[in-house]
C-alpha cells in the first residue's frame, strides 16, 4: 500500500469480507462477476491450460501471456477492438501477465471458520475478548461443545452428550429418533450454536467500549483490595489483573484501527495470486508445485462437500454435517498454520506441508529471506573489532568504506572550494588519493553521523548512530560498551554501516539514536552499556595484582625470601631481592612503570591522605618496625602507618598495585568530567 506521503509500506491485519471481495471481483462486459474460486483443479491434463474457475483460472487471475486470452486472441495496439478490455468469448482481460503476481481470488466458505492465528496464538485474541477459557473455545470450534443461544435462556457452554446421558437418560429411547427428523435441523439452528458460527455471533454482539469500561472498573477493584496474605489468592489476582490489562489494550487497538472483532472469523478465504504459488514443469514430465496449492485444493474439496450436504440438509444427518464443518475448519487451519493442531500435516511421501505461516516466518521466510537484509545505496559492511581509544559515541570507519560512503559529499566540497573544476577531475583526485581528499573527508565526517546495524535487529538498540572517525585497516572499530545493545562480540561478527542523507534523518540520528543517548534498556530500564567480555577480562587482569599476601613467611623451604623474584635461566633458578617500594604519589608510580622498575601487578605502597576512619580503627598491626631515630612503621593487612618518636602519625600508605592505580584514575577522571558537564547544564 502507499500512504499519503507516497511511501510504499506493508501492513498486515484483519480486513472485512467486503474488502476481500473488492480485491478479487471483476465484472465482465456481460455482467458476470468473477473472482470466486470454486474448483480444486489447476491445469487441464491434455491442453495444459488453466481450468475455468480453478486455482489458476485466467478469468480470475489474468492471462498467462501478456494481452493474450485463453482463446489465443491478442489485442494489439491500434486494433479495432482496442477499447475492449475483455475477450468476448472466454472473458479473460487483455492486460499484462504481471497481474498474476498481485491479483487475488477468494473461496466462499460454506460455514464460518476461525482464523487460527487469532484463536490459538499466544495470547489468544478471541479468548481475551470473549473472556472465555481457550480450551472451551477450541471445543466449541471443533464441535466438541455446543452453545445454547440466548433464546434458550442458558448462555453457557454445555456438553450435549453429557446432558442427554446424565440428565435425560430416562428419555433416551424417545429422544434418539428426534435427531434424524427434519425438525431437529430447525431446532438446532434456532436453539443451539456450534462451530465458528457461535464464535462469530458472540464477537458480533460485543461492545468494545463497554469492555473497556468494565475491565477498567474490575482492575481498579482488584487494585484496591491489596494483598490478602494468601499466596494462591494473590497469584490469581495478579494473573487476572494482567489479563484485564491485555483485554483493555486489545479492545483499544480494535477501536483505534476500526476493525470489527467478528472479522477474526472468516467467511471468505483469500486465495493468493498464482505467481506466488507456482507450478513448474521440468524435463521428463516432472511437475513441481507449491504446497500451498495442495492445501487450497483440500479446502475447496471439503468446502464443496459441505455445501453439497447443506443443500440436502433434509437427508444429511446432523452429525455428518458437523463432522464436515470440522474438516473444513481443520483444512483452513492447515493452510494457515500446519502445526497448529499439534503434529504438522504430511503428504503421501511423509513430507510436511509448508503452510502460509511457514512461508512467512523464520530465517528462510518471505520477509527475512526476500525482503529484508538487502543491499541498499550508501551502505557498507565489514567485520567489527574493538576500538579501545574511541569514545562511547564514536566508531572507526576504514578509509576504503568512508571514501565510498561520503564520495558525493567530498566531490561537492572539492568543487565548492575550487580544488577541482568538474566531477570527472574530482573523481580522479579521489582515485589517486591526494592529500586534500583526506582533509575534506575528515571535515565532512565531522558533521555527519552514520548508522551501525547488526542483524538480526530484534529491538531498537540493534541500530544506533555514531560519529565516524578514520582508522587504518579494513575493519570497523567499535567501543566495547555498546556491544550488549547489538548483542555483538569480536569473534568475527559483521555490521552494516548506513549513511543518513536527509536533514530529518540526521537530526533523528543525533537526537534519538546516538549511542550515548541509549544507556538504558528500553524493555526493563536496566543499564545496557556495561562492561562485558573483553572489558571484564581486561579489568580483571588490570586489578588482579600479585596473589602474594602480606602475611607470607619470611623464608620458604629453600631458605629464600618470598619477596624475591625467580629467574629461570639455563635451568638454574636465581633469586633477587624484590622490595615493595613506597611512592609519594600516583605520578611517581606511573613514572617508575614507564622506566620498567615495576610491573602492573607489582605490590607497592602508595602514600594516601590522612583518613580519620583509618586512624580510628582498632585493628592489630601485623608487624611493627622501629628505626634508630625513633620512627616506626605499623604494617597492617592493607595499609601502613608511619609515626615519629612522639607517637604522632606522619603519613599513611595503602598497599595496592599499578593496575589499581590506573583503574582508579580513569574512574576519577570520568566522574569529574560528568560533574563538570552536569554543572554546565544547571
Swiss-Prot record:
Q: Which GO terms describe its biological process?
A: DNA-templated transcription
GO molecular function per UniProt: DNA binding; DNA-directed RNA polymerase activity; magnesium ion binding; zinc ion binding
Q: Does the keyword Amino-acid biosynthesis apply?
A: no
Example GO CC term: the record gives: DNA-directed RNA polymerase complex
InterPro entries registered for this protein in UniProt = DNA-dir_RpoC_beta_prime, RNA_pol_asu, RNA_pol_N, RNA_pol_Rpb1_1, RNA_pol_Rpb1_3_sf, RNA_pol_Rpb1_clamp_domain, RNApol_RpoC1
Q: Which reaction does it catalyse?
A: RNA(n) + a ribonucleoside 5'-triphosphate = RNA(n+1) + diphosphate
Return the cofactor note field.
Binds 1 Mg(2+) ion per subunit.
Q: Which cofactor does it need?
A: Mg(2+); Zn(2+)
- Which residues bind Mg(2+) per the record? 489, 491, 493
- Subcellular localization(s) per the UniProt record: Plastid, Chloroplast
Q: Name one Pfam family in it.
A: RNA_pol_Rpb1_2
Q: What is its EC number?
A: 2.7.7.6
- Top EC class for this record: transferase
UniProt keywords, alphabetically: Chloroplast, DNA-directed RNA polymerase, Magnesium, Metal-binding, Nucleotidyltransferase, Plastid, Transcription, Transferase, Zinc
Q: At which positions is Zn(2+) bound?
A: 69, 71, 87, 90
Its biological purpose is as follows:
DNA-dependent RNA polymerase catalyzes the transcription of DNA into RNA using the four ribonucleoside triphosphates as substrates.
Family that this chain belongs to: Belongs to the RNA polymerase beta' chain family. RpoC1 subfamily.
Q: Which PANTHER family match?
A: DNA-DIRECTED RNA POLYMERASE, DNA-DIRECTED RNA POLYMERASE SUBUNIT BETA
Subunit-level organization: In plastids the minimal PEP RNA polymerase catalytic core is composed of four subunits: alpha, beta, beta', and beta''. When a (nuclear-encoded) sigma factor is associated with the core the holoenzyme is formed, which can initiate transcription.
Its name, as the record gives it, is DNA-directed RNA polymerase subunit beta'
Q: Which organism is it from?
A: Oryza sativa subsp. indica
Its organism's taxonomic lineage begins at: Eukaryota, Viridiplantae, Streptophyta, Embryophyta, Tracheophyta
